[in-house]
Structure formats: C-alpha cells, structure tokens
UniProtKB/Swiss-Prot annotation:
Coiled coil, from the record: none
Keyword list, A-Z: Ribonucleoprotein, Ribosomal protein, RNA-binding, rRNA-binding
Gene coding for it: rplF
Molecular functions per Gene Ontology: rRNA binding; structural constituent of ribosome
Keyword Ribonucleoprotein: yes
Annotated TM spans: none
Stored SUPFAM superfamilies: Ribosomal protein L6
S-S bonds: none
Function: This protein binds to the 23S rRNA, and is important in its secondary structure. It is located near the subunit interface in the base of the L7/L12 stalk, and near the tRNA binding site of the peptidyltransferase center.
Protein name listed in UniProt: Large ribosomal subunit protein uL6
Biological source species: Azoarcus sp. (strain BH72)
Gene3D superfamilies tied to this protein: Ribosomal protein L6, alpha-beta domain
Subunit organization: Part of the 50S ribosomal subunit.
Protein origin, superkingdom: Bacteria
Amino acid sequence: MSRVAKNPVVIPKGVEVSISAAEIAIKGPLGTLVRPQHPAVTVEQDGEALVCKARDGQVNARAMSGTVRALLNNMVVGVSKGFERKLLLVGVGYRAQAQGDKLNLSLGFSHPVVHQMPAGVKVETPSQTEIVIKGVDKQQVGQVAAEVRAYRAPEPYKGKGVRYSDEVVVLKETKKK
C-alpha cells in the first residue's frame, strides 16, 4: 500500500460523503464535487474518515490508492474551505478587471484579452494588478490560473508579465559589450 494511502481522509463536520459503485460524491457548505470510482481502488467510509485500499496487490493498484486518497482529500478541503490562487500583473499598463464571470485583461497587446471563467470558478480583482481565482475544485482553479498566466508569462529580463503571487522570477543579466 502507498504511504499516502495509509493515512485516512478525515471528514470535517458539515461535509457529507456518498459512495456508490460508480462514483464518490462529497457535499459541503461550499458545493458538491463528484469523482468516478477508480477500478483498482476501493474506498470505504469508516466513521468520520475515508479509507482507500488497493483491490489487489499489484503495484499500479497500490500506487493509485495514494493518488485517489490525495484527490479525495482535495475534494473534502475544497467543499469545506475552498481553494484560491493569487496572480500579480507586473508591467506598465498591465491591468485586470473582473466583470461577472469574465476577466478583462490589458496586457500590452493591441487588443484587450477577455477570459471566460468556467462554472464553479469565481474571480475577484482587489486591485488593478491583482487577480484572485477561487473555487471548490483544486484542479480547475489551478488550470484557470495557468491559462491566465499563459497570456503573458513573466519574461526573464525585466520580469514583466502575469505571475503567481508566490512565484520567484529569476532575472537574467543583459548582454554586456
């Protein structure tokens, strides 16, 4: 068994788990997440915890039990606390503005960039150079943040572009004559 899968997923108060043969649904105060069951892993509810075990002793099944456990833990944290990713815009004239489920970006192009947010993801702009992406699905929040960052990734000489708040951009030295 994977070392990760040995630890059970603790279910906090206010979170309900329903396990069927085909899928696992986790419902909490922030929303509901549904994930299909993996054929090589059994998931059982043991009181206030979820336990993942490999169906057989194969290496792939044991490895997947740890992966499934981590995904279930992300689901539980997502529906109870939620996830957020912060982005910073560095550069002259770089601005962001949230309008409902759309994010308007001015990134130095000849045209404004409009990014449509998927269902289940909210965007806020506390200032013109800050973007906060929130949601219950960790993978979806990270994917949206990566898509926004990809419009203008930080360049290595001045560091201008869209970056994660915790990202460190290593700057290159300019060419000397």
